[in-house]
A protein has these predicted regions:
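Short, flexible loop/hinge motifs at secondary-structure junctions
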Residues: 1-182, 223, 253, 391, ...
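Catalytic center-proximal scaffold of phosphoryl-transfer enzymes
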Residues: 27, 116-117, 154-156, 161-527
Length: 527
């Protein structure tokens, strides 16, 4: 009997444990469902306004162990550069401002008869003495194409033509084709690449658009052109951008998945990755560089950063692969930290300051509020460093102290947020060392967004060559955008000047978007 009872007790204990595990899992799934609903139907921003302000309580931050904010005391005023400004409603742009980048043609009205032009007083024919613009309209010209034929001429000697040794010479030295054996030109190739990568139009839709213009160009042909333009020209320029990037002191990195159908030894469903590397706020011409890689391995991060200067500041998220990068000062992205805590807030508790997830968000918001203030006042990096030490360091210290006091169990969203924050402990204050460092990795996230937007339309790359070409073309296009260039003009400019592996970095720099001649030729934005 005792044995039977023991078995029953053990069985009941196991069932209770299984039931508790199921309840925990149910709670986690419910939390996931609430998060998905919040992402679909809730606010799209993680920033929460502070509604808890009244005459007796100027700020809620003392509740979190942070002293109320006082008026900033000047620190070495010679470093502070404050520009006065007045917030006002943005004036509506004029028609001339709206269309300042398009050419203007004029039609002179000639509706008066000869009789109408006679002076009613003396009968003399009146002469033009001035003009005025009656109205304006914008004309759309449908894109057009034409075939350009290079015609060579053969010259023969009229005297020797009937002899046994007729003499002739051929004038057939036409400019080299963009791609040997192909009929594409810099203008056609640049338009296709601009539509595909800047406007995210898939090749199959471009195929139809070209057919409407009278040209039958298959999507396969267009894809091959992209690959060959990359291997022949773009790659040499983007490699130069990467080499220049490695010389910078402030770097930012991010990555996002893509799908490549035909990778050696991998299934079509395998995840591949786009890696982004860009310059930070260093006062130099900004550089963006994209790289395709079959994996998210830290070896990719190591390869991308091979050759950087020791002591470089690297801003990235908490992905462990970046741990392989040595000799850098890692900066933590507080936007990621805030996002973790924001996603841990239970539905309907966004304004509940007693909720620990809300408190975590408020710590982050406090830091960002200081950064916004520095930007509004146009502080120089030297001043930002001093202000951060005074304003932001105490916030981070209080944040860490608060985190260490939290007691969590299970695998909840808040537990994950807290773990993510604590795991960044060694890097939380790195950005305080230099005023050029940023508080978040938002620049990288914004820079990688064009790839994610394009991915929704074209879904995948067919081959490794196609993926590599795509990333280099994205590099060219986003560099043009970053420097205020017309993206299609810049693509065409590069294809006309044809960078090669034989060019030195000095020669390649003449094709960079910050070059004066490039700015003058391609300098009108298309975005």
């Amino acid at each position: 009997l005792n044995t039977t009872v023991k078995h029953l007790v053990d069985a009941l204990t196991q069932k209770d444990k299984a039931l508790a595990d199921m309840q925990t899992r149910l709670d986690e799934m419910t939390e996931e469902l609430k998060l998905l609903r919040k992402k679909l139907f809730g606010s799209s921003t993680e920033h929460m306004s502070n509604p808890y302000v009244n005459s007796d309580q100027l700020t809620i931050y003392p509740f979190l162990g942070i002293e109320p904010e006082k008026e900033s005391e000047p620190i070495e005023a010679e470093y502070i550069e404050i520009q006065s400004y007045t917030k006002s409603k943005k004036a509506k742009s004029t028609l001339k401002e709206q269309f300042s980048n398009i050419p203007v043609k004029q039609v002179f009205i000639d509706s008066l008869s000869d009789e109408d032009k006679l002076c009613p007083a003396c009968g003399t024919e009146m002469q033009p003495i001035g003009t005025e613009i009656i109205r304006r309209e914008v004309i759309h010209v449908k894109p057009s194409m034409y075939m350009l034929e290079y015609v060579g001429t053969t010259y023969g000697c009229p005297v020797c033509k009937d002899t046994e040794d007729p003499q002739f010479v051929k004038d057939n030295k036409a400019p080299a084709a963009l791609i040997k054996g192909s009929y594409t030109s810099p203008s056609l190739a640049s338009w296709i690449l601009y539509e595909k990568f800047a406007k995210s139009v898939p090749f199959y839709r471009l195929e139809k658009s070209l057919e409407e213009l009278g040209a039958k160009v298959s999507r396969t042909t267009m894809a091959n052109w992209a690959i060959q333009c990359n291997s022949l020209y773009f790659k040499h320029l983007t490699d130069y951008f990467h080499r220049e990037l490695l010389k910078r002191k402030y770097l930012m990195m991010d990555e996002t998945p893509i799908q490549v159908l035909h990778e050696p030894g991998r299934t079509p469903e395998s995840k591949s990755y786009v890696w982004l590397m860009r310059s930070g706020n260093d006062g130099l011409p900004p550089i963006i560089y994209y790289r395709y890689a079959p994996t998210r391995s830290g070896d990719v991060a190591l390869e991308l950063t091979d050759g950087i200067q020791p002591g470089t500041y690297l801003m990235c998220d908490g992905f462990s692969g970046y741990n392989k990068v040595k000799d850098v000062r890692r900066c933590t992205c507080y936007a990621h930290i805030r996002r973790y805590f924001y996603e841990a807030i239970p539905a309907g508790h966004d304004r509940d300051i007693t909720n620990p997830a809300v408190q975590g968000v408020m710590y982050c918001n406090k830091l960002f509020s200081y950064e916004n203030k520095y930007a509004e006042r146009h502080y120089k990096p030297e001043t930002i460093k001093k202000r951060r030490a005074k304003d932001e360091k105490p916030v981070i210290e209080a944040f860490l102290d608060w985190a260490d006091k939290q007691v969590v169990t299970g695998n909840s969203k808040f537990s994950k947020a807290l773990t993510y924050f604590k795991n960044r402990r060694n890097d939380l204050m790195t950005y305080l060392e230099d005023g050029h460092c940023s508080l978040s990795n938002n620049w990288s996230e914004n820079s990688i967004r064009p790839v994610t937007v394009g991915r929704k339309n074209w879904l995948f790359s067919s081959s490794v060559d196609g993926a590599e070409a795509s990333m280099n073309i994205y590099t060219i296009i986003e560099m043009a955008k970053l420097h205020g260039l017309n993206r299609q003009k810049y693509l065409e400019y590069i294809l006309e000047h044809r960078p090669s592996a034989e060019m030195t970095d000095e020669e390649l720099s003449l094709l960079a978007p910050w070059n004066k001649d490039v700015q003058e030729t391609c300098g009108k934005c298309d975005h």
